[in-house]
A protein has these predicted regions:
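Active-site neighborhood of HAD-like aspartate-dependent phosphohydrolases
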Residues: 1-45
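An amphipathic alpha-helix signature
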Residues: 22-30, 65, 69, 127, ...
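Generic helix-packing signal
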Residues: 29-30, 75-76, 96, 134
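A metal-dependent, Asp-based hydrolase signature
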Residues: 35, 48-94
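Juxtamembrane/interface motifs at transmembrane-helix termini
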Residues: 36-38, 64, 105-108
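Substrate-recognition element of Asp-dependent hydrolases with the DxDx(T/V) motif
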Residues: 82-101, 106-134
């Protein structure tokens, strides 16, 4: 039997929290646009935009922000105020600035594995966003 020499990790929500920040931001987005559409419908429209845009923007915060802006324009009939677009950009900036907090035991586990294995990060996320987390 061959000895395992390399271990790959999917980082987001495996090594550190990630999805919870997207969900919290989505709640704030829904509140920003509450006057235009029911929260559940707005969430569904945002999800449609995210899926439609994956091939164009990929995974990550920047693609999420662009999908939120696109959704805001769509649900407002093009009348979304510039200040609301600014608020959406602010939500994205907050996500990008949020400190990375590893999940319990991750640091110790990686340090131990690094002594005997090559460790690699496997991600579908935005390169710049993922690199800032390392």
């Amino acid at each position: 039997m061959k000895h395992l020499t390399t271990i790959g990790f999917d980082a987001d929500d495996t090594l550190w929290q990630n999805e919870q920040f997207f969900r919290m931001t989505e709640e704030r987005f829904r509140a920003l646009l509450a006057g235009h559409m029911d929260a559940d419908q707005l969430g569904a429209r945002l999800l449609e935009a995210e899926k439609r845009n994956l091939g164009r923007y990929g995974f990550g915060i920047k693609g999420f922000m662009l999908s939120m802006i696109e959704t805001a324009i769509e649900v407002s009939g093009g009348d979304v105020p510039a200040s609301t677009i600014g608020d959406i950009l602010g939500l994205g900036r907050e996500m990008l600035a949020h400190p990375v907090e590893t999940l319990p035991g991750v640091r110790e586990t990686l340090e131990e594995l690094a002594d005997s294995h090559r460790l690699v990060l496997i991600t579908k996320g935005d390169l710049f966003d993922q690199e800032r987390k390392l």
